[in-house]
Amino acid sequence: MRKFTAFACGTGAGLAAFYLQRLRDPKQTAWVHNSWTNSERPVDSWALWDSNWDCRDPKSLVRPQKNEQPQEQNRYNSDFEKNHAKSARHIILIRHGEYLDVGDTDDTHHLTERGREQAKFTGQRLHDLGIKWDKVIASTMVRAQETADIILNEIDYDKAKVTNCAYLREGAPIPPQPPVGHWKPEASQFFRDGARIEAAFRRYFHRAYPDQTKESYTLIVGHGNVIRYFVCRALQFPPEAWLRISINHASITWLTISPSGNVSIKYLGDSGFMPVKHLTNRIPRDAKNVV
């Protein structure tokens, strides 16, 4: 009888606590229910995909129909087709190889021997993928330039056609969440670098132009912070989350922008094609002026 009484009391207390919680916070119960069982109704409005994130959704570029007359419908449909993307864009992002942070200027920040080998492995990997490149773009910083040069020795692309872009230089894109104690740039650096890196994102990340008739492949050689920020922005994740991601030196990140504007990620920091001894993501311990 004592065991039965204890069991009944325990069950009753549990049920009472459950219903009391429901009475106190019914919204929280609905939140849990929706988050696990109803994918069509996101809990947070931030989870909704913005289909016009690049301001190139044809619906936003075409003058709306004035009426339902056939002539007006034909005009709208014709304008819509002229502004509608028809092919996908593949953007492949490569982080530079390992380098030494020696000296106070970028001119002295050269790749280590291992960094050069990493870049060669990446170039060979890209060659093996058999991609026909439409564009190759590189940050103007020395370590990215050296990485791009080594990669270009391995792939089929004319070095004279490479675009060098200062917008892609390394920097502090946005204050990260959660904050970290070992890396705290001044607010002025975020103010300066953030606008530039966001401008780079808007320059290179968008759906294909309407006159593009086949899938395109763009190779961008850049930096860890910039690439991680690009990934968060492209996938419409909170951009403040960029520092939660880690990518290795000379790794491959592959994003695809479909004609509809949807974005998917194929690789994130892929470096599995390298020997284990070549897997690095930080400046070597023997570097000077480590930041």
UniProtKB/Swiss-Prot annotation:
Class of this enzyme: hydrolase
Principal subcellular localisation of the protein: mitochondrion
Membrane topology: Single-pass membrane protein
Compositionally skewed regions (Polar residues) per UniProt: 67-77
EC number in record: 3.1.3.16
Pfam families per the UniProt record, alphabetical: His_Phos_1
SMART domains: PGAM
Organism the protein comes from: Drosophila willistoni
Protein name: Serine/threonine-protein phosphatase Pgam5, mitochondrial
Similarity remark: Belongs to the phosphoglycerate mutase family. BPG-dependent PGAM subfamily.
Quaternary structure, from the entry: Interacts with Pk92B/ASK1.
Keyword Protein biosynthesis: no
Transmembrane segments: 7-23
Catalytic reaction annotation: O-phospho-L-seryl-[protein] + H2O = L-seryl-[protein] + phosphate; O-phospho-L-threonyl-[protein] + H2O = L-threonyl-[protein] + phosphate
Keyword terms: Hydrolase, Membrane, Mitochondrion, Mitochondrion outer membrane, Transmembrane, Transmembrane helix
Record flagged with keyword Cytoplasm: no
UniProt xrefs under InterPro entries: His_Pase_superF_clade-1, His_PPase_superfam, Mito_Ser/Thr_phosphatase
GO terms of biological process kind: positive regulation of mitochondrial fission; protein dephosphorylation
Places the protein is found: Mitochondrion outer membrane
Function: Displays phosphatase activity for serine/threonine residues, and dephosphorylates and activates Pk92B kinase. Has apparently no phosphoglycerate mutase activity.
MF-aspect GO terms: phosphoprotein phosphatase activity; protein serine/threonine phosphatase activity
Cited SUPFAM superfamilies: Phosphoglycerate mutase-like
One GO cellular component term: mitochondrial outer membrane
Region named Disordered: 59-78
Superkingdom to which the source organism belongs: Eukaryota
